[in-house]
From Swiss-Prot:
Subcellular location: Virion
Chief place of localization: virion
Protein name: Early transcription factor large subunit homolog
Function: Putative initation factor.
Record key words, sorted: Transcription, Transcription regulation, Virion
Transcription found in the keyword field: yes
Cellular component GO terms held in the UniProt record: virion component
Length: 1340
């Protein structure tokens, strides 16, 4: 990395220009801090001796005369490239302006590459005496005249060439003006760019001093401005055009009382004395930075960008295509589904009701409205994708530019390359999906380029970065550091705001920071109030963003937005950490030099601080508890920040309390130690850096390093000092040895250890390590299960893993794997297969409804439990119920629970498990859910378990313990209602089907009545078991038994189960006056249905009649099968809708045909021009743009100019061939030369190949054709298309051709035809998928 000031050897020349006389008057050359002999040789000018010339040649190089000349030379490409006027100089091969001999002055003020044009104005002021508000600065870039602001009229740029001043013939007060400006003054807008462009490679600028015009005519001007109209003519026609720093009031003060300017407008006319003092201090400090930069870079460059000394914590990548792309963000939003992976989408577009924001989110999204209140400038879509619980945000604008952003932990230590790689990997699948949408997303063709494409520009912006200076300071040293920054504050390089925290120094770095959004200042909140009236708050648009120089409210807002980059310096035990916020990669490199030169000056050179203000290596030995803990967390946060991986984990300071934490050293620190000291260290591992680390235990009471296992969520071993040394052969010795070798201690290590060392069973109530066993609580073992087991068998609880990455309560998952004797991942794979079923929604008593499909649920199971990439917070509380159901389906295994929360043990069993327990065939597992975790119960023999972990986890009817479980379950299910079990016991009848609802409960049975019509018998919502009785998830059947058969069965049921007696309370009658059932008595009456009859059964004659205005079955059908049986009226409506919109579909095909006939002639002209142009010669480039303007418009010229500047001439032609220009869409004009009849015939010829003719149109659902594109290329399901042609009834085609011909020939309509034929039928009608929620907001 180079860091040097080119302006020292190629100085900036500032030439004064007098517009009144159209002449150059004086040149100032800013030499800066050059050697005295160079300064003396420069000032001799025409009297230079050969020796002087030799001095200048040695310092400035062979072209020293050119560098110190008075020629106008254009600079290199830079940021101010969006100007409306291309300047072509009439004379001079290299577009240099030859000036007569004028006075040359030499200034010792330095110019730096990081100077903005705002800084340059101040330096011109101290050198020339011309205050900033009187300076009109212009310069040349790429042969174009440019200024430091933009003037827009009704949104279009105004040409700003002060050299045309004398060409204006209308005068006010003796000054030439552009009178057209006054008549359109409300449409004028000034965008100040001084603060947003660096001087960089521009070495010659020109300044027109307003005083050269005003001073001679001050009396005449004073008289003229007394008239408001003349004042407006003068202000808007001259001042605002060329000197926009002046407000109307400031201009009036300049004319009437110029000596008051400094007092009234200090920002426009700062104190010259104060400014000179500040600039000289700035020059001293920046010169020092440049002088020491290369030395510091060489010293620290080796680790400047390494993982240990750099951490990007947030970043935004901007992808800018070099080709024109138009993307319909509204359609992308509509076609892109919300999923658990991409749970949130927001779009801003202009709908038929105005600016509109629409958001949608998956029902599992935790922050559904997070981005809907954002301020948008152009149509934009935002997609939020989650990977490993980390959010990645993709923002796509309608011009094809898109932004990718995310945040990371500092401990992840991402550098610039890994940030780009990570964000690219995130974006690629989404870009592919959008590109597959075809013309629905890209109405003018094209696609979004991937970040790896060559036809794009990639820039990293809005980064937050942490970097580390590998030295530390004492408290006094850090205080000294703070005090040394005061000079930088006085020089205006930094700005310090607010209160400072202990151990942190916070400031804004201002110098050289220019990558801001100039538009952010545009909207201002203007608050006005007065006596007797309330405060009035209005949002107004600034007309002139230079207002920050003459309006204190705007100045405060400006300072807030553009005040610099936030820098924080942290005083740490092991180093100095520096955080930089919202910076670009270019700014990072620049700021890094400034900061590290400053810090290095603290320890080297003549200004280094005293030794007692430096923290020495041996300070680690004497650190207090807090500082030791800080040192450990700073050097290896992945190891010592346990809550990074599990928010419930016990913190290290509790696990290893003072004075037991050890001291950590890096390899570099160890190398500088004496050999004797080195021998005392224990080599271990730095998990954050992935390199060895060394530990010592300096406290005399705790001199021996030990390693704690089982505490870290990732099974890392935690260093902690102990009183005694672990003895050979002991459990602690084995653990320490394993940790030092493998750095972790996992389940298999524990099993190996238990095999060697464990000889006892734990008492109940403690956390149970993996593969250890514990006794049951005494009230269960000694009372409930006392007679169900014989020695030497015992009941015990078996320890299993309790956490995994992303799931803090994974004990049930590991318990099920242990019970089924499966590897945990194998279990997850099998139940994921079972989850991918059409009836996924019944799982977990309806918890499956969270997901849009069984495939989505299965995918999430695999992501969470196999890949360990969990994204959903809700998943943490719902997976257990779903897993229990899936295990029951896959393995016919049901679980009962003993839940012990704070000492109260309760027996819990689900209704479906009760059904299984009460059945003859059962497989049951018993699980303990305690405060310490979830563990399976097993029957084993203690010695056998210690030897080979053999145990029984599944219990069947043959096991005595099942008698207890059966008895407890039977007691829990007796609640006064009948269920499936009772109905099955009616003699002479057989249950043939169970009906199941979406919450996985049985709600009715079909019973064989001995006829062809089964009896429909409702039951309370009941759990069920998978047995030989078929289940059905469909609607209530209509082919059922009549009343007589149904009542016969009910009578038998009432006789057998008097406690459940079914008593009718009301007769059910439908709207056809048919009797269809009855309602039973009770708080929760059930609906009994039978075959419809016109005759009221005698049994029910005395009951009231309840009319069903709509059968509940019809409601269920409308919910479950909304498209199965459309109403006849809907067919007619859909046909009418299709016919009414068929003209729009035809327009799409028409324009697609025309796009295929793009202007190849124009493209050929451009390619020929490229071949003939030598882009190394300015005259040739000038001729290129001149000829180009003959056949393309200004917007296309700017596009071509931008491509040339960003890609270079060699690659530009390839990019141009891919691009789409305005001239490609000048398509209708040739058709207007036809007569009406000729045009009709021509249109028929063009469009007939695109049409599939029909006698009559079939029914088409209007919802399917809301988004429409050409049938030729559509990637959508478009029912109006067949064989890639548009379906049109024969009798409509002629009419549409006639209408189209009339519209093309109508001068009032042809220009809007394209807009008529693009987009959607109803832009506020969106596809609503299951599990999606959509919100629409109007933005006014």
């Amino acid at each position: 990395m180079e860091f040097q000031n080119d302006f020292l050897t190629n100085p900036l020349r500032v030439t004064l220009y007098n517009p009144a006389e159209n002449e150059y008057t004086k040149t100032f050359i800013f030499l800066g801090s050059v050697p005295a002999n160079v300064l003396q040789a420069c000032r001799k000018d025409l009297q230079r001796t050969p020796k002087d010339k030799e001095i200048l040649q040695n310092f400035y190089g062979e072209d020293w005369e050119k560098k110190l000349s008075q020629y106008v030379v254009g600079g290199d490409s830079d940021d101010l490239d969006e100007f409306e006027k291309l300047f072509v100089e009439d004379s001079g091969e290299e577009a240099n302006v030859m000036m007569p001999e004028i006075e040359t002055m030499y200034s010792e003020y330095s110019i730096f590459p990081e100077d903005t044009f705002k800084d340059i104005r101040e330096k011109i002021y101290v050198a020339t005496g011309i205050p900033p508000y009187r300076q009109h600065i212009f310069f040349f870039q790429n042969n174009a005249l440019q200024v430091t602001y933009r003037l827009l009229l009704s949104g279009s740029g105004v040409a700003l060439d002060i050299r045309d001043y004398k060409k204006e013939f209308q005068q006010v007060g003796g000054l030439n003006i552009d009178a057209s400006m006054e008549s359109q003054k409300d449409e004028l807008y000034v965008e100040a760019l001084d603060s947003f462009q660096l001087i960089k490679n521009i070495h010659h600028i020109f300044v027109a001093d307003l005083n050269t015009l005003v001073a001679p005519m001050r009396r005449q001007i004073s008289i003229a401005i007394e008239d408001n109209y003349q004042f407006d003519l003068l202000y808007y026609g001259l001042i605002m055009k060329y000197w926009p720093l002046l407000s109307p009031d400031a201009f009036k003060l300049l004319i009437q009382s110029p000596l008051q300017m400094e007092k009234q407008y200090p920002a426009l006319s700062p104190s010259l004395t104060s400014l000179k003092k500040r600039l000289l201090l700035e020059q001293k400090l920046i010169n020092f930075t440049y002088a020491k930069a290369q030395q510091v870079i060489a010293k620290y460059e080796g680790n400047r960008l390494t993982r240990g000394t750099l951490a990007v914590t947030s970043a935004m990548i901007k992808i800018s295509p070099l080709v024109n792309i138009q993307i319909n963000v509204r359609n992308v939003f509509d076609l892109f589904p919300a999923t658990p992976d991409i749970p949130q989408l927001v779009v801003f577009f202009y709908s038929k009701t105005g600016p509109t924001v629409v958001s949608k989110h998956h029902i599992t999204s935790t922050e559904p409205e997070k981005f809907s209140n954002k301020t948008f400038r152009v149509p934009t879509i935002i997609l939020i994708r989650f990977i490993n619980k980390k959010a990645f945000i993709l923002t796509i604008q309608n011009n094809g530019h898109y932004f990718i952003e995310s945040n990371w932990s500092e401990n992840e230590r991402h550098d610039f390359n890994s940030v780009v790689s990570t964000l690219n990997n995130f974006i690629n699948p989404i870009i592919h999906t959008i590109n597959d949408m075809g013309p629905a997303a890209f109405p003018r063709g094209g696609s979004l380029p991937l970040p790896s494409n060559e036809d794009i520009q990639i820039s990293i912006s809005s980064m937050s970065v942490s970097t580390f200076w590998p030295y530390t300071l004492s408290s006094k040293g850090f205080t000294e550091l703070k005090s040394r920054w005061r000079e930088y504050e006085q020089a205006g390089i930094i700005s310090v705001r607010g209160l400072q925290q202990t151990g942190v120094y916070n400031f804004l770095f201002k110098k050289g920071i220019y990558s801001y959004d100039p538009h952010e200042i545009e909207r201002m909140i203007i608050i006005s109030s007065g006596p007797g009236r309330k405060m009035d708050i209005n949002v107004a648009l600034l007309q002139n963003t230079y207002a920050y120089l003459f309006d204190t409210n705007v100045a405060a807002r400006w300072e807030t937005i553009y005040g610099g980059r936030n820098i924080r310096i942290y005083h740490r035990v092991t180093d100095i950490k520096i955080e930089m916020f919202n910076i670009t990669q270019e700014e990072f490199n620049y700021l890094w030099v400034y900061l590290f030169v400053f810090l290095d000056n603290m320890i080297s050179g003549p200004d280094k601080i005293m030794v007692n203000k430096l923290s020495q290596l041996h300070d680690k030995q004497q650190g207090k508890g807090a500082s030791q803990l800080r040192a450990l967390q700073e050097q290896d946060p992945d190891l010592y920040d346990l809550r990074k991986y599990d928010t419930q984990a016990t913190v290290y300071s509790v696990l290893c309390q003072h004075p037991r934490p050890p001291v950590i050293y890096s390899e570099a620190e160890v190398k500088s130690m004496p050999p004797a000291k080195r021998k005392e260290l224990v080599k271990y591992w730095n998990f954050t850096e992935g390199v060895p680390a060394y530990y010592s235990c300096p406290h005399p009471d705790y001199p021996h390093l030990s390693l704690l296992e089982g505490r870290h969520p990732l099974n890392y071993c935690l260093p902690c000092c102990q009183k005694t040394k672990a003895l050979l052969g002991t459990k602690r010795f084995y653990i320490n040895n394993t940790c030092l070798t493998k750095h972790t201690f996992v389940e298999q290590d524990l099993e190996d250890l238990n095999t060697q060392t464990s000889r006892h069973t734990l008492s109940y109530g403690k956390k149970i390590p993996v593969n250890r066993i514990a006794f049951l609580p005494h009230q269960i073992a000694d009372e409930l299960f006392s007679n169900t087991i014989k020695e030497p068998d015992i009941f015990c609880i078996v320890g299993v893993e309790q956490t995994m990455l992303g799931i803090s309560n994974a004990g049930l998952f590991y318990s099920l794997a242990r019970i089924l004797d499966l590897a945990p991942k194998a279990l997850a794979v099998e139940i994921a297969k079972a989850a991918n079923t059409p009836q996924y929604y019944i799982l977990g008593n309806g918890a499956g409804n969270m997901f849009s499909s069984g495939a989505e649920l299965a995918n999430l199971i695999l992501q969470t439990f196999v890949e360990q990439k969990n994204q959903l917070l809700q998943w943490d509380t719902t997976w257990q119920d779903i897993f229990l159901d899936l295990v029951a389906i896959c393995y016919d295994l049901h679980c009962v629970f003993f839940k012990d929360k704070q000492g109260d043990i309760e027996f819990e069993v689900s209704p479906s498990t009760i059904q299984k327990i009460l059945s003859p065939s059962k497989k049951i597992a018993i699980i303990f859910d305690t405060d310490e975790g979830i563990y399976p119960m097993a029957m084993t023999q203690q010695k056998r378990f210690l030897k080979n972990s053999e145990a029984q986890y599944i219990f069947t009817e043959d096991d005595p313990v099942m008698e207890v479980i059966h008895s407890m379950s039977e007691f829990m299910c007796k609640d006064g209602w009948w269920d499936i079990h009772d109905v099955k016991n009616i003699p002479g009848y057989t249950v043939t089907k169970k009906f199941i609802n979406r919450h996985n409960f049985c709600y009715a049975l079909l019973i064989d009545s001995g006829t062809d019509r089964p009896i429909y018998f409702p039951i309370r919502l009941s759990s069920y078991i998978h047995d030989d009785i078929p289940i059905d998830f469909d609607l209530r059947p209509t082919h059922i038994a009549g009343f007589e058969e149904t009542w016969k069965f009910i009578s038998l049921f009432n006789k057998q189960y008097k406690q459940y007696e079914i008593i009718p309370s009301a007769v059910l009658q439908n709207i056809k006056k048919e009797f269809v059932g009855f309602l039973s008595e009770g708080k929760t009456g059930l609906y009994f249905y039978y075959a419809p009859t016109q005759t009221l059964p005698a049994t029910l004659e005395k009951l009231p009649i309840a009319t069903l205005t709509m059968d509940p079955r019809d409601i269920d059908q409308a919910i479950l099968y909304p498209l199965e049986e459309p109403y006849p009226q809907q067919d007619k409506a859909n046909k009418a809708f299709y016919i009414n919109h068929l003209y729009k579909f035809l327009l799409i095909e028409f324009f697609d045909v025309l796009y295929g006939l793009q202007s190849n002639t124009t493209r050929k002209h451009i390619e020929d021009l490229f071949q003939k142009t030598d882009f190394q010669k300015i005259n040739s480039v000038t001729e290129f743009y001149t000829k180009l303007s003959d056949f393309v418009d200004l917007n296309d010229i700017h596009t071509i100019k931008h491509i040339l500047e960003t890609t270079g001439a060699e690659h530009a032609l390839k990019v141009l061939q891919k691009n789409v220009f305005n001239f490609d869409y000048v398509l209708l004009s040739p058709l207007q030369s036809y007569t009406y009849d000729e045009l009709c015939q021509h249109l028929k010829k063009l469009l007939t190949p695109r049409i599939e003719f029909y006698e009559d149109i079939e029914t088409i659902d209007r919802g399917l054709i809301n988004i429409y594109t050409s049938c030729q290329y559509s990637t959508l399901n478009q029912p109006q298309c067949e064989k890639k042609r548009l379906r049109i009834p024969v009798n409509h085609f002629e009419n549409y051709i006639n209408i189209l011909a009339a519209d093309i020939l109508n001068p009032l309509k042809h220009s809007t035809l394209l807009l008529t034929g693009l987009g959607v039928i109803d832009d506020l009608q969106f596809i609503l998928r299951p599990q999606e929620i959509i919100n629409v907001k109007n933005k006014f």
